[in-house]
Amino acid sequence: MEDSFLESFGRLSLQQRQQQPPPRPPPARGPPPRRHSFRKHLYLLRGLPGSGKTTLARQLQHDYPRALIFSTDDFFFKEDGTYEFNPNLLEEAHEWNQRRARKAMRNGISPIIIDNTNLHAWEMKPYAVMALENNYEVIFREPDTRWKFNVQELARRNIHGVPKEKIQRMKERYEHNVTFHSVLHAEKPSRANRNQGRNSEPSSGSGYWNTYTELPNRRANGLYSNEGYRRGGHHQGY
């Protein structure tokens, strides 16, 4: 009796095991998630007057024919190609250049090259913010010239006649080893501090004051409306 019961229980257990679905295999593991890859790039050029920024910008545009170059200096070129700097319009010129860069980013242009002196991290912050908003990778570039911090040679080479004394003071204020993080979190000094620094510089009539503020959308009378890059490539419509 007991043997018959055990035999029946064994057959029942075997039937139950046979009716149970086989265990599911563990889910297949796909490849590890890829790090974000930027498809668009913003080059922020930095350097003292005469260090070779414009030459570097042209070389980048040669390497990347779709590149657009934006320089605050463009604001002060007249239609006949002459350069006429007005220090009272400099902050407006920076704001104008930032608008052009912003429009190009919204249109997905890549790469975009900003050809300014960019002495301080905070001066590049508007462009870094734009890059973050429009998914651009920021690449900082300086000219690789042997004279890029040689004040006497810079005074001789720069095309706007910036004197040696002014370049020396710019060199002393130049921030080295900037990063995207430091630029993004940089604080703009107060207007009083910026004016104090401006008044301490010798007057040269050259356009090398990298300041940024929000100003009305207007252009200087007599300045060209075709906003092409007067020292190199062309980008109509910006």
From Swiss-Prot:
Q: Where is the composition biased (Polar residues)?
A: 192-212
**InterPro entries, alphabetically?**
NEDD4-bd_p2, P-loop_NTPase
Keyword Repeat assigned: no
Tell me the segments the record calls region Disordered. 1-36, 183-212
Q: Which SUPFAM superfamilies match?
A: P-loop containing nucleoside triphosphate hydrolases
- Which keywords fit this entry according to its UniProt record? Developmental protein
Give the superkingdom in one word: Eukaryota
Induction of its expression: Up-regulated by USF1 in 3T3-L1 cells. Up-regulated by FOXO1 in 3T3-L1 cells.
The Pro residues compositionally biased stretches are 20-31
**Its quaternary structure?**
Interacts with dynactin subunit proteins, including DCTN4, DCTN5 and DCTN5.
General function of this protein: Might play a role in adipocyte differentiation and triglyceride accumulation.
What is this protein identified as?
NEDD4-binding protein 2-like 1
Provide the taxonomic classification: Eukaryota, Metazoa, Chordata, Craniata, Vertebrata
